[in-house]
């Protein structure tokens, strides 16, 4: 939108609508809630209505809201590439083909607004999600929806980073700025595999996205191994940001002091709200999804 010759910057929140194949198959290694609920009875209709209610609540607050539609499931093309069909697939493969996890919009893409990029356009890179089989075939459907939603010269939509470099999208990316319109600092959080669970975001993928988007004010931060081992399979399970506020657990980052120092140097206005372990343990933070929330600017 243009106001006085200038582009108006609007923050848009996207949610994914759960599909009818929603089920609890326990497919997500490192996601303790997924493992705990494996085999449970899913209620796709109730879940979809909950999601719609949440989106309506955002709209009632005056926020701009978008939606990702459910993808076609089972993914017959993915099964065909593995030499089978839904009727003949082993139960494990069929469960992966039926997954409705594309609803998790935080894993759809990494977004760099125009104020942060060299060419002055908003860049979006669809996440490849290669670490988990049930999510590795989502990107084609997500990319098609991104290209439809952002079919405007003000936006540049990119395909996925190639395997084997894992990219999990916005769940491992944060942006902080004095205001949404101002140039910001983009924070790419990556993991290092070595514990009981895989690190899903690779630093190679994070740096590639930053280069492709033309982002120069970027900080690459390692997620703490302790957080990953405790079940923080994405950074957004232990940290969340909006505008100038960073809300994070004390044990979210491997070198929080260095990260906070670099962040304050680039963005003196930043407000860091850190929750100490003495107040909320990592276990409680992950089980409650305290940080896996949405911060908005009203």
Residue ranges with predicted function:
Residues 1-298:
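Histidine/cysteine-enriched polar flanking segments
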């Amino acid at each position: 939108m243009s106001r006085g010759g200038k582009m108006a910057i609007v923050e848009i929140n996207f949610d994914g609508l759960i599909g009818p194949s929603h089920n609890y198959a326990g497919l997500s290694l490192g996601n303790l809630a997924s493992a705990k609920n494996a085999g449970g009875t899913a209620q796709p209709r109730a879940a979809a209505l909950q999601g719609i209610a949440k989106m309506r609540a955002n709209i009632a607050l005056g926020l701009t809201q978008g939606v990702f539609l459910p993808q076609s499931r089972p993914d017959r093309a993915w099964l065909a590439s593995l030499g089978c069909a839904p009727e003949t697939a082993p139960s494990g493969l069929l469960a992966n083909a039926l997954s409705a996890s594309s609803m998790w919009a935080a894993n759809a893409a990494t977004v760099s607004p125009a104020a942060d990029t060299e060419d002055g356009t908003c860049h979006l890179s669809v996440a490849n999600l290669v670490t988990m089989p049930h999510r590795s075939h989502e990107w084609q459907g997500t990319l098609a929806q991104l290209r439809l939603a952002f079919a405007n010269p003000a936006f540049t939509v990119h395909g996925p980073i190639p395997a084997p470099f894992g990219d999990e999208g916005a769940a491992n990316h944060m942006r902080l700025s004095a205001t949404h319109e101002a140039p910001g600092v983009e924070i790419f959080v990556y993991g290092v595999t070595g514990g009981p669970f895989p690190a899903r975001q690779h630093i190679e993928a994070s740096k590639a996205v930053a280069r492709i988007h033309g982002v120069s004010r970027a900080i690459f931060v390692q997620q703490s191994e302790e957080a990953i081992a405790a079940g923080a399979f994405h950074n957004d399970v232990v940290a969340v940001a909006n505008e100038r506020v960073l809300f994070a657990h004390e044990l979210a980052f491997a070198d929080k002091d260095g990260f906070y120092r670099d962040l304050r140097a680039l963005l003196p206005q930043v407000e860091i709200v850190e929750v100490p372990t003495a107040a909320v343990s990592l276990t409680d933070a992950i089980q409650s999804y305290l940080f896996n929330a949405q911060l908005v600017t009203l």
